[in-house]
Amino acid sequence: MKVTLIAILTCAAVLVLHTTAAEEFEAESQLMEVGMPDTELAAVDEERLFECSVSCEIEKEGNKDCKKKKCKGGWKCKFNMCVKV
């Protein structure tokens, strides 16, 4: 009886550890996939590019000096566009 109980508990522990390891591996493999589009980052990139170029055009139309908006977070404004530094 004790041997059966120990065998069942051992199998249950192995199953739990195997399932946890498989879930971690799946999560890591999804993060490591190359070519998988990240729509949130793409949207941020488009917003930054749009924000920099539009702000400059608006200031030119108002007969004011073109003061480029400062792009933050490793970006800089160049040719009226935010570019990654």
UniProtKB/Swiss-Prot annotation:
Question: Which residues would be cut away as propeptide?
Answer: 23-48
List cystine links.
C52-C66, C56-C77, C71-C82
Q: Which UniProt keywords apply?
A: Disulfide bond, Neurotoxin, Postsynaptic neurotoxin, Secreted, Signal, Toxin
The signal peptide stretch is 1-22
Q: What's a Pfam family in this record? A: Toxin_20
CC terms in the record's Gene Ontology section = extracellular region; host cell postsynaptic membrane
Which compartments is it annotated to reside in? Secreted
Q: In which tissues is it expressed?
A: Expressed by the venom gland.
Name any one GO molecular function: toxin activity
Where mainly found? secreted
Q: Which InterPro entries match?
A: Hwtx-2-like
Q: What does this protein do?
A: Neurotoxin active on both insects and mammals.
Give the family per the record: Belongs to the neurotoxin 12 (Hwtx-2) family. 02 (Hwtx-2) subfamily.
SUBUNIT field = Monomer.
Name of the molecule in the record: U4-theraphotoxin-Hhn1a
Name the species this protein comes from. Cyriopagopus hainanus
